[in-house]
Regions:
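N-terminal intrinsically disordered/low-complexity leader segments
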Residues: 1-22, 216
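Amphipathic alpha-helical interface segments
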Residues: 30, 34, 107, 181-188
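Helix-turn-helix
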Residues: 26, 30-76
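Hydrophobic/aromatic-rich alpha-helical bundle segments in the mid-to-C-terminal region
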Residues: 15, 136-137, 141, 145, ...
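Amphipathic alpha-helical segments used for helix-helix packing
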Residues: 113-141, 187, 191
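Amphipathic, non-transmembrane alpha-helical scaffold segments
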Residues: 20, 28, 74, 78, ...
């Protein structure tokens, strides 16, 4: 395994201790710091223990190994994203669909930093997680699945308001496009040094779904 290409960016402020209580939050923050700078493949339990200020055997009393620790990190992060997004998604209003979607898009700024400290973390998530079936299941169970279910509940309400009839297959296909645009915009906003265009993305989402506000 080659680790020469691992990132050496400086991690940002503690993240998990803001919402995960006790020692678990401290361990997850230590793991995040190591994985952000070394990558998942190159980061070690020994380095995480050193970051935390404990011995490696002490860390193993909390987690069976690096995979279990990383899976818990993914799950905790996913749960927090869903918790923060749920209120916004559940409040989406078909009668004000563009404004509601714009609020959903812009809400990310409250919770996602837009600076270089985010890049190594996102690189870690999108390189290590997709190659591991267990990690993919964690992401589905804690992030993708709950988000999809909430949006799946909104789409029929919006469709009914605008007089759109879709088959179950069409709804699933539309939901995938909708999520691809939303998630892709958020991720590229964190990874690329390009200006935001919330208005344009909201317009594109409305157009893709066929929710013409003038129809109301």
């Amino acid at each position: 395994m080659q680790c020469s290409g691992a990132s050496h960016a400086t991690p940002g402020a503690p993240y998990f201790t803001e919402f995960v209580e006790g020692r678990r939050g401290e361990i997850l923050d230590a793991a995040l710091a190591v994985f952000a700078t070394k990558g998942y493949e190159c980061g070690t339990m020994r380095e995480i223990a050193a970051e935390l200020g404990v011995t490696e055997p002490a860390l193993y009393r909390h987690y069976a190994g690096k995979e279990a620790l990383f899976a818990d990190l993914l799950g905790a992060a996913g749960d927090q994203v869903v918790l923060r997004a749920s209120a916004v998604i559940d409040a989406l209003d078909p009668a004000r669909v563009r404004e509601s979607l714009l609020g959903l898009i812009s809400a990310r700024r409250t919770h996602v930093p837009h600076d270089d400290s985010t890049k190594p973390v996102m690189q870690m998530l999108f390189t290590a997680a997709p190659r591991n079936g267990a990690f993919r299941e964690v992401i589905r169970g804690h992030l993708a699945g709950p988000m999809l279910e909430r949006l799946r509940a909104f789409i029929p309400r919006a469709d009914a308001y605008y007089g759109i009839v879709r088959s179950p297959e069409e709804t699933t296909a539309s939901l995938r496009i909708f999520m691809s645009l939303l998630v892709g915009y958020v991720i590229t906003g964190m990874m690329l040094d390009v200006p935001d265009d919330d208005e344009g993305v909201a317009d594109a989402m409305v157009a893709i779904m066929g929710w013409d506000a003038t129809a109301a």
